[in-house]
Regions:
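Conserved beta-strand-loop-alpha-helix junction that forms the acyl-donor binding cleft
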Residues: 129-139, 154-157
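Conserved beta-strand in the GNAT
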Residues: 61, 67-76, 94, 99
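A short beta-loop-alpha structural element at the N-terminal edge
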Residues: 6-20
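Conserved GNAT acetyl-CoA-binding A-motif
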Residues: 114, 121-133
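Conserved active-site tyrosine of GNAT-family acetyltransferases
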Residues: 141, 146
């Protein structure tokens, strides 16, 4: 077994991998506590990913010997124009679902996925990329140049 990590942008054929990694993320975060509705969740995830992959959601996977060890997602939206010129209709990105299997953490894998996401966002002409960081992930993002923005407010509906 080699330790070489390869990172690639996912295609629709990767749905099974993406669903598996999303389930691991949800279990670890405490959202999936039992197996009662797991099959239904798997079906919903498959449908959602198939309808959004490489349209408004872009997924990356890091693999070692073709085994997925980390994933990340970039979603985006077009920002409403605020003035004439450069920012008119520019895209804003949001990184979500960064997940690395525990035994592969602290090896720079997630950082490398985020670097690929940033590069892709730049190529799409994004104004900025945002995210909500876990405590464990804050260092990763700060080291890559992300800054804290405390201007967000939200209401849960």
């Amino acid at each position: 077994m080699s330790n070489a990590v390869s990172i690639r942008k996912c295609e629709i054929s990767d749905v099974e991998i993406l669903v598996k990694m999303r389930l691991e993320f949800l279990k670890e975060a405490g959202y999936v506590k039992d197996t009662t509705n797991v099959q239904e969740l798997i079906q919903e995830l498959e449908e959602y990913i198939r309808s959004h992959v490489n349209k408004d959601l872009f997924f990356w996977v890091a693999e070692i010997d073709t085994v997925a060890v980390s994933t990340g997602v970039l979603m985006f939206w077009d920002k409403l124009p605020i003035c004439a010129g450069k920012q008119n209709g520019s895209k804003v990105g949001y990184v979500s679902n960064m997940y690395t299997i525990p035994k592969f953490r602290r090896k720079g894998i997630a950082s490398n996925i985020v670097k690929e996401i940033i590069k892709y966002g730049k190529n799409l002409g994004m104004l900025k990329i945002m995210l909500h960081a876990s405590e464990d992930g804050k260092g990763v993002y700060k080291n890559l140049g992300f800054t804290t923005n405390e201007s967000f407010m939200e209401i849960k509906l």
